């Protein structure tokens, strides 16, 4: 079974496997305050929608610990500010907002009961543990459903990193692939390098190598040739936010793959927990797309590879329209990418 631990909570500190340093170094980044958590999410020490949701929850717990000696009024003000700051770390992944809303609601309940700040911290910390543990259990259920659409001998294409590193320990799209491998299916995986941050090359390849699961790393630009030549049987991708009509925001390059999949009639599955669905978003137009630093495109590991004084467009995500998606694999089953089926699984 997978041994990757993307996060640990020990001695009132959150330890995050620093994904910026993989695959070269396996080091943990220590978060002692909610500000550390904000930095870790924003600067992609940790990444992946399900994981940053859990990490955000721990950020609220650390804020409660930080202000444990304040008056109830001051405690309430500071924790509210902390939640607001944490929510600004990254705008697209809805799991972060889902987790923060859950923590904020619980905080409001315990504050209404006039609970002392020193007694609130363990309650909030326990809730963060629950969110993290439940996320892992969701991954297992997702993997069981997803394995049903993988046949022995399948050649699979995946994009970005959707494994243990993107969740609290198993994976969404990569978790489905992992489950098929554990069930002794003869599969082969093609991994997009996923520019510009190379999550496929640095993270997914690292996870698959640890699992001894047969794979090949490919340039993003070669996916079309593989699909056209009939070398891909099914495509699995993750999601950062799914609108109520099935439109899906995911790592930049996903939309391009979905167009190819539709043209060449290759099944294209989005894999995500229900917490990734934004039931308030009518369609992809309601989803904010994060734009990141130009340095992610013009530099590789700090070395300039492009001319200076040029314009750069670097969206972190794109929107795949529902009509390009075969199905959405969740912990509640495989559903169609449409409003009717999506609304039936609303929590």
Swiss-Prot record:
It is an enzyme of class 5 (isomerase). Substrate binds at residues 47-49, 90, 199, 250-251. The keyword Signal does not apply. SUPFAM superfamilies: NagB/RpiA/CoA transferase-like. GO terms for biological process: L-methionine salvage from methylthioadenosine. Belongs to the eIF-2B alpha/beta/delta subunits family. MtnA subfamily. Disulfide bonds: none annotated. InterPro entries: IF-2B-related, IF-M1Pi, IF_2B-like_C, Initiation_fac_2B_a/b/d, M1Pi_N, NagB/RpiA_transferase-like. Signal peptide: none annotated. It catalyses: 5-(methylsulfanyl)-alpha-D-ribose 1-phosphate = 5-(methylsulfanyl)-D-ribulose 1-phosphate. This is Methylthioribose-1-phosphate isomerase. The active site is at residue 240. The gene is mtnA. Catalyzes the interconversion of methylthioribose-1-phosphate (MTR-1-P) into methylthioribulose-1-phosphate (MTRu-1-P). Its EC number is 5.3.1.23. It comes from the Bacteria.
């Amino acid at each position: 079974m997978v041994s990757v631990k993307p996060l640990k909570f020990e001695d009132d500190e959150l330890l995050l496997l620093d994904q910026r340093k993989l695959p070269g170094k396996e080091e943990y980044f220590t978060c002692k305050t909610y500000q550390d958590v904000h930095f870790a999410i924003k600067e992609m020490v940790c990444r992946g929608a399900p994981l940053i949701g859990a990490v955000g929850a721990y950020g609220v717990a650390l804020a409660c610990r930080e202000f444990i000696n304040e008056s109830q009024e001051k405690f309430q003000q500071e924790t509210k500010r902390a939640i607001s700051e944490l929510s600004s770390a990254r705008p697209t992944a809805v799991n972060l907002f889902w987790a923060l809303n859950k923590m904020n609601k619980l905080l409001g309940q315990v504050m209404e009961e006039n609970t002392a700040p020193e007694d609130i911290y363990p309650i909030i910390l326990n809730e963060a543990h629950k969110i993290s543990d439940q996320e892992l259990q969701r991954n297992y259920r997702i993997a069981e459903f997803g394995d049903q659409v993988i046949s022995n001998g399948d050649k699979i294409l995946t994009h970005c990193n959707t494994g243990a590193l993107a969740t609290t320990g198993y994976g969404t799209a990569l978790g489905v692939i992992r489950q098929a491998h554990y069930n002794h299916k003869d599969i082969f995986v093609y991994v997009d390098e996923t520019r510009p941050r190379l999550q496929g090359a640095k993270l997914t390849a690292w996870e698959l190598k640890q699992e001894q699961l047969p794979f090949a790393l490919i340039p993003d630009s070669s996916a079309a040739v593989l699909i056209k030549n009939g070398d891909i049987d099914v495509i699995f991708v993750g999601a950062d936010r799914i609108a109520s009509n099935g439109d899906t925001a995911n790592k930049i390059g996903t939309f391009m793959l979905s167009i190819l999949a539709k043209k060449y009639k290759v099944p294209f599955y989005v894999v995500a927990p229900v917490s990734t669905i934004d039931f308030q978003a009518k369609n992809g137009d309601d989803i904010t797309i994060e734009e990141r630093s130009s340095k992610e495109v013009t530099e590789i590991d700090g070395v300039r590879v492009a001319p200076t004084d040029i314009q750069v467009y670097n969206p972190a995500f794109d929107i795949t329209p529902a009509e390009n998606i075969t199905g959405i694999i969740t912990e509640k089953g495989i559903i169609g990418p449409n409003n009717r089926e999506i609304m039936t699984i609303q929590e």
